[in-house]
């Protein structure tokens, strides 16, 4: 089989093309836009399906370089930090605690569901944990980390199972989040909270699609340069902040968490000393970074790993989707306040509890693009999905493995 290796330049060029392709398809297929399916997801999945077909026929396999994909992800989260003011941080405090509590409940729920299904089929219950929070709440990184632990506990193919389930979760989380939020918003006739004079909200330019002609703003080159330099400053300092936090606490703080926190400080210092802040320019750059990152991430999915799943795994993953929808629709939405912010956070919760924080942000942004901003959701979801939940997930995974052995 011919193997095609795309370097980081080829990969980012392909991601740009797939974003445009996804935009054309979503414009032509009303069902996709009606249910808030992001354009990068559509374009990326089109390519990953093609890649899967070529791989299955033994023709070729296409591999991506994720170097720039990671950079774009960090840059995007930095722009999210720049949208947050101190009042928004204080307002998001309760939301962060509640969202974290709900997420902690979801972890054993996923694991016991997976383990129970596998036990019913006469399989090792630990295989179900590989289809549970290891892959879903944890995502591909946690799946790669805990897969060998499952194999050490006697589960044959634990790594492959976990990574394949995580791949499924990325797709499912992206597909489920937008439509669920749409249903909640329209059923309860929800609207964004009015913006106070001192508050800030993420602008529509942070949505998944590039700004339309109705979202124009007046700018110039110096303002874009100033915004980009602020981003680079926050990314550089934030990376070191993440290193320090990891060393001090023993927890793993991703680079984008530090960058996001530094961006919050820079933004509020600039506002406090009344220095001009290029809000629209940074928001527009955030839109670009997210769009290309998500297209590249989806294009790189190895969908053929799903084809090789045994029937119990398929049933387990389908049930995980059903339980996730029911839990999000009836529990997350109600606990978080039954308002517009709660609906947006429901989309984000599905994204990171089924896949990754990047999926959560994409889900929320495609919803807020259509219905309006949600500052609380924009701060709470990345903080829970990117900073806190990995620690609790690791502890509960270890406890659940001990339960089934």
What is the role of each PLM region?
Residues 113, 117-157, 161, 168, ...:
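Alpha-helical membrane segments and immediately flanking helix-loop junctions
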Residues 116-123, 166-208, 330-340, 385-405:
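Juxtamembrane and boundary regions of transmembrane helices in multi-pass small-molecule transporters
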Residues 3-17, 63-76, 126-133, 250-262, ...:
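Structural signature of hydrophobic alpha-helical transmembrane segments
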Residues 18, 45-52, 65-93, 234, ...:
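Hydrophobic transmembrane alpha-helices of secondary-active transporters
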């Amino acid at each position: 089989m011919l193997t095609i290796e795309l370097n980081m330049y080829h990969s980012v060029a392909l991601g740009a093309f797939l974003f445009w392709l996804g935009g054309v398809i979503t414009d032509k297929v009303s069902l996709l836009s009606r249910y808030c399916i992001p354009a990068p997801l559509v374009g990326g999945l089109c390519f990953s399906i093609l890649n899967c077909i070529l791989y299955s026929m033994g023709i070729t396999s296409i591999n991506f370089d994720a170097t720039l994909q990671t950079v774009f992800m960090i840059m995007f989260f930095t722009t999210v930090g720049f949208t947050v003011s101190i009042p928004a941080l204080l307002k998001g405090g309760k939301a962060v605690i509640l969202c974290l509590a709900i997420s902690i409940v979801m972890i054993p729920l996923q694991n016991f569901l997976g383990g129970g299904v596998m036990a019913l089929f006469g399989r090792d219950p630990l295989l179900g944990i590989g289809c549970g929070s290891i892959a879903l709440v944890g995502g591909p990184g946690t799946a790669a980390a805990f897969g060998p632990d499952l194999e050490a506990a006697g589960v044959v193919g634990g790594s492959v199972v976990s990574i394949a389930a995580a791949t499924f979760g990325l797709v499912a989380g992206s597909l489920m989040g937008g439509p669920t939020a749409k249903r909640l918003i329209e059923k309860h006739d929800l609207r964004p909270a009015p913006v106070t004079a001192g508050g800030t909200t993420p602008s529509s330019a942070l949505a998944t699609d590039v700004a339309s002609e109705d979202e124009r703003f007046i700018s110039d080159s110096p303002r874009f340069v100033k915004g980009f330099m602020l981003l680079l400053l926050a990314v550089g300092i934030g990376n070191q902040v993440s290193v320090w936090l990891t060393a001090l606490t023993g927890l793993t703080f991703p680079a984008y968490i530090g960058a996001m926190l530094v961006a919050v400080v820079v933004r509020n210092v600039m506002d406090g000393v009344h220095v001009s802040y290029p809000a629209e320019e940074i928001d527009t750059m955030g839109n670009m970074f997210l769009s290309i990152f998500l297209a590249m991430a989806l294009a790189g999915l190895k969908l053929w790993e799903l084809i090789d799943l045994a029937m119990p795994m398929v049933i387990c993953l389908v049930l995980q989707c059903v339980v996730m929808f029911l839990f999000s629709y009836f529990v997350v939405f109600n606990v978080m306040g039954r308002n517009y912010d709660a609906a947006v956070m429901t989309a984000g919760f599905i994204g990171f509890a089924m896949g990754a924080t990047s999926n959560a942000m994409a889900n929320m942004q495609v919803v807020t693009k259509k219905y309006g901003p949600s500052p609380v959701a924009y701060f709470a979801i990345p903080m829970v999905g990117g900073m806190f939940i990995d620690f609790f997930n690791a502890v509960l995974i270890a406890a659940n493995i001990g339960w089934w052995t």
